[in-house]
């Protein structure tokens, strides 16, 4: 396969500024001139301190918020130029797993309705039985039971809620998923289960991830390559093992120093 075909997402000089009311100028520069590529089937980890722009970058790539400038090439086409109809069709391929599952799930809907909504919107089921079978399969895929379809989000633990969020993202059979700090709101005992599940799904379904987190130990475990953001810019991008061995930017060096000290304290 050629290098061009290996690249699923190509971000070129992407910028996102948020205007400040009553203040002239570009405003808050949340994402500043970022260019990255994400290869088909890989996990690109994205780390940085709170407020560095990593979540904004992920949402801008998905066009959940509009870009100020730049390009987002998906399979060689700039999706930032798509009209509403074409972008709606593209939504099946692009999904997101949110940080806080309790806030991202509609409390008035059952789990079956939440997962089934995406199936209905994109008309993926031939009939009611097909729809029910799809929901059942998605629940099983994330480690939940068929009976859970009739329950509401508040009846689940945080880890179970996040599994519902993952099932919802998978419902449309996507190619690319932005995982926006998907385990930061979960208990430590549950985090590894969710990460392992995401890895298994990637291998089985050929998924491509942009995995956003502030916990370097998690990102190091799941990612093929890691990008480091600082004040809206990408200050470092390297293979996971190489970044671990030879961090170059001061922020990355300090982050790995703290991680190694924490790992040493545990033994």
Describe every region a protein language model picked out:
Residues 52, 257-264:
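Conserved small/polar residues in nucleotide/adenosyl-binding loops
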Residues 237, 245-260:
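C-terminal boundary and immediately downstream tail of ABC-type ATPase nucleotide-binding domains
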Residues 1-247:
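ABC transporter nucleotide-binding domains
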């Amino acid at each position: 396969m050629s290098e061009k075909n290996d690249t699923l997402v190509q971000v070129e000089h992407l910028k996102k500024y948020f205007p400040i009311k009553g203040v002239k100028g570009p405003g808050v520069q949340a994402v500043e001139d970022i260019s990255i590529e994400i290869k088909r089937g890989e996990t690109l980890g994205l780390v940085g301190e709170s407020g560095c722009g990593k979540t904004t970058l992920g949402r801008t790539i998905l066009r959940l918020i509009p870009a100020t400038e730049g390009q987002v090439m998906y399979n060689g086409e700039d999706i930032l130029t798509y009209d509403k109809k074409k972008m709606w069709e593209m939504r099946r391929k692009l999904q997101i797993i949110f940080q806080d599952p309790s806030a991202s799930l509609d409390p008035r809907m059952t789990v079956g309705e939440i997962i089934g909504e995406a199936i209905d919107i994109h008309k993926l089921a031939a009939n009611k039985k097909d729809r029910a079978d799809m929901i059942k399969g998605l629940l099983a895929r994330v480690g939940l039971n068929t009976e859970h379809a009739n329950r509401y989000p508040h009846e689940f633990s945080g880890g179970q809620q996040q599994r519902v969020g993952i099932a919802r993202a998978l419902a449309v059979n996507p190619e690319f998923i932005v995982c926006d700090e998907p385990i930061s709101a979960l208990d430590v005992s549950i985090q590894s289960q969710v990460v392992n599940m995401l890895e298994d799904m990637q291998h089985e379904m050929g998924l491509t991830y942009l995995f956003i987190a502030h916990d370097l130990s998690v990102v190091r475990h799941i990612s093929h390559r890691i990008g480091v953001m600082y004040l809206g810019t990408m200050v470092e991008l390297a293979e996971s093992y190489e970044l671990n061995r030879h961090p170059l930017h001061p922020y990355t060096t300090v982050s790995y120093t703290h991680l190694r000290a924490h790992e040493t304290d545990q033994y």
